[in-house]
Design a protein with these regions (language model features):
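A conserved regulatory-domain signal marking ACT and ACT-like small-molecule sensing domains
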Residues: 1-84
Length: 84
């Protein structure tokens, strides 16, 4: 369900391969989510831990659909989300 005026944070575990992060961020872009912050730690054992916070009020799709599309990105291992 679309939350008016809310900020969502998505924590993702990615394979440390070229293009995975940009493909993940493209999903946010295509959904018209306004990205506020991106944090990524140095990859460990081939896995990168990324946190993305975005405003969700103007998204063109529901949050559940966004999460589904993020998980479909090749190289995404795990996703957790917090809608605040």
């Amino acid at each position: 369900k679309k939350e008016t005026g809310s900020i969502m944070t998505v924590q993702v575990v990615l394979n440390d391969k070229p293009g995975v992060l940009v493909n993940l961020l493209t999903v946010f872009y295509k959904a018209n989510a306004n990205i506020l912050t991106i944090n990524q730690n140095i990859p460990v054992k081939g896995k990168a831990f990324v946190s993305v916070s975005a405003r969700s009020e103007n998204m063109s799709i529901e949050i559940d659909e966004l999460l589904k599309r993020l998980f479909e990105v090749q190289g995404v291992i795990k996703i957790d989300s917090i809608v605040g």
